[in-house]
């Protein structure tokens, strides 16, 4: 099949980019022909190795650098252009003989836009992928899903570990298991550990992501062997960058602790993750009970055990022995959980390997893609 992927998010790196790469590579592996549909003058930050089809309707609208006064105008402009892109996509699907369309990152607003355009009457399956439905989003989502239900080729595929937020009366609203993220090379990592044991904390650093309790817990923890912790932070705002550097300076003399203030992209991101033995995720928010955690599924795909807060996709640790849950209520509870997790890995390095192997099998890319395109 020729499968079009409509992408309107411009990102130099991150999970949106890796998700697109995942879809494209798996479609290729299965013998399909993926093509990208993008707005006019779209700047590709990654070479996906596929043809591009340019949509009419204007360029991508970005909020980057916009004042709070300008954002409402940009929001309206984005909605208008989204409808124009969908209208153009309806024509391009026929013009380029596409057999299906995938919109890889959607919200309920995408359904509203769809219903204002000819794309709702597409002659081929159109798949809107939702990366979870939050508790507060459910009513709005289901309202739009009910409106879209009359159009037989519109599929709303929700990546989730739970289906209690969906409705059995809507047969084309389908739960899809989350996929693991793997190295950009497509190679399957192997499980391994080092001495000293290497821990990693990765991702976007913001002021509200308080890492001080973790650092204090690591500083005072009693491990049964040598341990290192790398704290990587990518920062978007100057004040976040200044805070990260100040924290790194304050803790620079802690044995085994190192900091990396950098935005890791592509092979640099892969290497940093592959170099550690386990990943720490001592942060939580209620939304992670409804939205899948891309960082957790990165840890699984890279065969790294994870120490996570209880809110982060609790179904994963319930069903797979890929790490431990961490009480983040105080430095003392973090220290106790960190010691237990690390000492288990030091004393029994293979303790999580079987769980990681099983999770990678169940959350593989083939299963996700089959769930989407087999209608």
Regions found by a protein language model. Give the residues of each.
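A short, active-site helix/loop in glycosyltransferases that binds the activated sugar's phosphate group
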Residues: 134-175
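Nucleotide-activated donor-binding/catalytic signature segment of Leloir-type glycosyltransferases, i.e.
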Residues: 242-270, 275
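A short, glycine/small-residue-rich beta-strand->loop->alpha-helix junction that serves as a flexible
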Residues: 7-22, 44, 206-209
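Conserved donor-binding/catalytic core segment of Leloir-type glycosyltransferases
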Residues: 190-209, 215-219, 229-230
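A charged, aromatic-enriched C-terminal amphipathic alpha-helix characteristic of glycosyltransferases
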Residues: 14-15, 328-336, 343-375
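Nucleotide-activated donor-dependent transferases that construct or modify glycoconjugates
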Residues: 1-14, 201, 280
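Glycosyltransferase donor-sugar binding loop
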Residues: 228-244, 262
